[in-house]
Amino acid sequence: MALKKFNPTTPSRRQMTMPTFEEVTTNAPEKSLLVSLKKTGGRNAQGKITVRHHGGGAKRKYRIIDFKRNKDGIPAKVATVEYDPNRSAYIALVVYADGEKRYILAPVGLKVGDTVVSGPEADIKPGNALQLKHMPVGTFVHNIELQAGKGGQMVRSAGTSAQLMAKEGNYATLRLPSGEMRYVRIECKATVGTVSNTTHEIVNIGKAGRKRHMGWRPTVRGSVMNPCDHPHGGGEGRSPIGRPSPVTPWGKPALGYKTRKNKKYSDRFIIKRRNAK
């Protein structure tokens, strides 16, 4: 999980860092678990831009990941640890005792040859998946379900983990990576351990071309647009925005405008918000 630096042949190479990929064991994915991905350019079915600055980028194939971990009691052996262009974490190809192959999120410390298993009898070790009610308090987990059987939805990014803080009645209390304290049904599954590629958050992209490879196009400032394109646009030369505070292209407050509904159903499960003092 180290970072590679480069000789300063250009100003961008001086700053650029990249993972060493020392945990990755192969660059040939399992073909039966690949699906083609179509480029959208940030457009929806009507052709309207729904995500700005999207387009281009290297071709990718989607890897089908097993977020449900529903083959209980059948051990699986780790065949490879691979890079996945669609997510920040590494993935592991596991081969079950009955011959089925699946991809799972690779936790820190998982190596080729290790055995993982899911179900109530599973040991508390990285890569094993079981319901929260079968885990001891204090366990670090990832790939957490919000509804039992639906598959993991929370804590899937590189280097993240949540901690099981308490179990009471039908609910377990989790501390999420954001600092939020939240109830989750005790029948929900989670995977033990921390997600791999922990140095992802300190990688320096270094140059614009690398961002283009990822499918991100340049972001134009509103102040250099025309008034018809942005509320900050217009004026002679470098003009001030002419407003008390910056806004989005649609006139909404920028820089931290709250968009969460104040009567959302899941509010009852949140004990402490992530930004609570």
Swiss-Prot record:
Quaternary structure, from the entry: Part of the 50S ribosomal subunit. Forms a bridge to the 30S subunit in the 70S ribosome.
Any GO CC annotation of this UniProt entry: large ribosomal subunit
Keyword RNA-binding: yes
UniProt family annotation: Belongs to the universal ribosomal protein uL2 family.
Protein task: One of the primary rRNA binding proteins. Required for association of the 30S and 50S subunits to form the 70S ribosome, for tRNA binding and peptide bond formation. It has been suggested to have peptidyltransferase activity; this is somewhat controversial. Makes several contacts with the 16S rRNA in the 70S ribosome.
Listed GO biological process terms: cytoplasmic translation
Gene Ontology molecular function, alphabetical: rRNA binding; structural constituent of ribosome; transferase activity
InterPro entries from the UniProt entry: NA-bd_OB-fold, Rib_uL2_dom2, Ribosomal_uL2, Ribosomal_uL2_bac/org-type, Ribosomal_uL2_C, Ribosomal_uL2_CS, Ribosomal_uL2_dom3, Ribosomal_uL2_RNA-bd_dom
Keywords: Ribonucleoprotein, Ribosomal protein, RNA-binding, rRNA-binding
Encoding gene per record: rplB
SMART domains: Ribosomal_L2, Ribosomal_L2_C
Descriptive protein name: Large ribosomal subunit protein uL2
Keyword Cell cycle tagged: no
Annotated region (Disordered), positions in chain: 222-258
Listed HAMAP family: Ribosomal_uL2_B (MF_01320_B)
